[in-house]
Curated annotation (Swiss-Prot):
The gene is MT-CYB. Binds 2 heme b groups non-covalently. Its main location: mitochondrion. A ubiquinone binds at H202. The chain crosses the membrane at residues 34-54, 78-99, 114-134, 179-199, 227-247, 289-309, 321-341, 348-368. Its cofactor is heme b. It comes from Gallus lafayettii (Sri Lanka junglefowl). Heme b b562 binds at H84, H183. Keywords: Electron transport, Heme, Iron, Membrane, Metal-binding, Mitochondrion, Mitochondrion inner membrane, Respiratory chain, Transmembrane, Transmembrane helix, Transport, Ubiquinone. This is Cytochrome b. Heme 1 (or BL or b562) is low-potential and absorbs at about 562 nm, and heme 2 (or BH or b566) is high-potential and absorbs at about 566 nm. The cytochrome bc1 complex contains 11 subunits: 3 respiratory subunits (MT-CYB, CYC1 and UQCRFS1), 2 core proteins (UQCRC1 and UQCRC2) and 6 low-molecular weight proteins (UQCRH/QCR6, UQCRB/QCR7, UQCRQ/QCR8, UQCR10/QCR9, UQCR11/QCR10 and a cleavage product of UQCRFS1). This cytochrome bc1 complex then forms a dimer. PANTHER family: CYTOCHROME B. The lineage of its organism: Eukaryota, Metazoa, Chordata, Craniata, Vertebrata. GO terms for molecular function: metal ion binding; ubiquinol-cytochrome-c reductase activity.
């Protein structure tokens, strides 16, 4: 029999083993679709970003007008920009759902896969932050000022670090130039780390909703999951295109239609919606260094999740108490997101502080405790 080129060619063999003949569990649900959706998001962002970069000028006197020029005068420039801006939102929607799936079904027990995933999240957050600064509107400028200023809370080296980040004594032209360079570079770093993420995943194979070994019951990735992924893609593309074409500025801040002005501070400085939960945690502590540490901890806590797993069962499928706690955490994050968008005044401050406290309590104390309790309940 003639050798199949798909299985013998050095490059095609890799693609075949990752996307065609890959043995996959037969029972993975739609929650396992988000990995491929994230890959599509990344490719879309790189493509639209590349097209935008061709018309963008990274200079404080020209950045705002170059973006306006792209939208007005470039063929379909408005479309490319709207896809890129809203693509970022859908990227975060998918990554949050992907992480939520990992938490619910105990996928974090594949430690290397989980840790590279958290690194991917951090890189994505950095990329989105520097990208938001590029249009050089009011919220771009003041967002950059507020967030970079947080580095000054680091003892001893803080102030030096901030001025080094800025390339001067305030957010100015050097800052914009380096942020553009970083925004161009980081997505390719994300693509590279994604390959590492997948390499680790394919060492063990996918987890599944039951959390038990699926070695005895595998099906080929293609055609089953390749088709399922295309269905998932069309289901994501529908709301994405609806948003980008019908209300492209729904998730943006109106303040960003005003060119950056260092002499006028906007009444409410707030980041894009996907950072609001962390921003609320930052603001809930009335001390600069404390706030910065809480902000960092709100995301870095994900690295600890594998060590806080105390249950004898991997997934939450058959653990109603942990399920309740999980959805409590989701509700808590929604409250934090809402608080992050509100001004710092009563009653929002106290709600934010309570939500921040419960966020860390649920993850660090309640999850391991309930896991241990459920183990004990198995004996009765």
């Amino acid at each position: 029999m003639a050798p199949n080129i798909r299985k013998s060619h050095p490059l095609l063999k890799m693609i075949n083993n990752s996307l065609i003949d890959l043995p996959a569990p037969s029972n993975i649900s739609a929650w396992w679709n988000f990995g491929s959706l994230l890959a599509v998001c990344l490719m879309t962002q790189i493509l639209t970003g590349l097209l935008l970069a061709m018309h963008y000028t990274a200079d404080t006197s020209l950045a705002f007008s170059s973006v306006a020029h792209t939208c007005r005068n470039v063929q379909y420039g408005w479309l490319i920009r709207n896809l890129h801006a809203n693509g970022a939102s859908f990227f975060f929607i998918c990554i949050f759902l992907h992480i939520g799936r990992g938490l619910y079904y105990g996928s974090y027990l594949y430690k290397e896969t989980w840790n590279t995933g958290v690194i991917l999240l951090l890189t994505l957050m950095a990329t989105a932050f520097v990208g938001y600064v590029l249009p050089w509107g009011q919220m771009s400028f003041w967002g950059a000022t507020v967030i970079t200023n947080l580095f000054s809370a680091i003892p001893y080296i803080g102030q030096t670090l901030v001025e080094w980040t800025w390339g001067g004594f305030s957010v100015d032209n050097p800052t914009l130039t380096r942020f553009f360079a970083l925004h161009f570079l980081l997505p390719f770093a994300i693509a590279g780390i994604t390959v590492v993420h997948l390499t680790f995943l394919h060492e063990s194979g996918s987890n599944n909703p039951l959390g038990i070994s699926s070695n005895s019951d595998k099906i080929p990735f293609h055609p089953y999951y390749s088709l399922k992924d295309i269905l998932g893609l069309t289901l994501m593309l529908t709301p994405f295109l609806t948003l980008a074409l019908f209300s492209p500025n729904l998730l943006g801040d109106p303040e960003n239609f005003t060119p950056a002005n260092p002499l006028v501070t906007p009444p409410h400085i707030k980041p894009e919606w996907y950072f609001l939960f962390a921003y609320a945690i930052l603001r809930s502590i009335p001390n600069k260094l404390g706030g910065v540490l809480a902000l960092a901890a709100s995301v870095l806590i994900l690295f600890l999740i594998p060590f806080l797993h105390k249950s004898k069962q991997r997934t939450m499928t058959f653990r109603p108490l942990s399920q309740t706690l999980f959805w409590l955490l989701v509700a808590n994050l929604l409250i934090l997101t809402w608080i992050g968008s509100q001004p710092v005044e009563h009653p929002f401050m106290i709600i934010g502080q309570m939500a921040s406290l419960s966020y860390f309590t649920i993850l660090l104390i309640l999850f391991p405790t309930i896991g241990t309790l459920e183990n004990k309940m198995l004996n009765y």
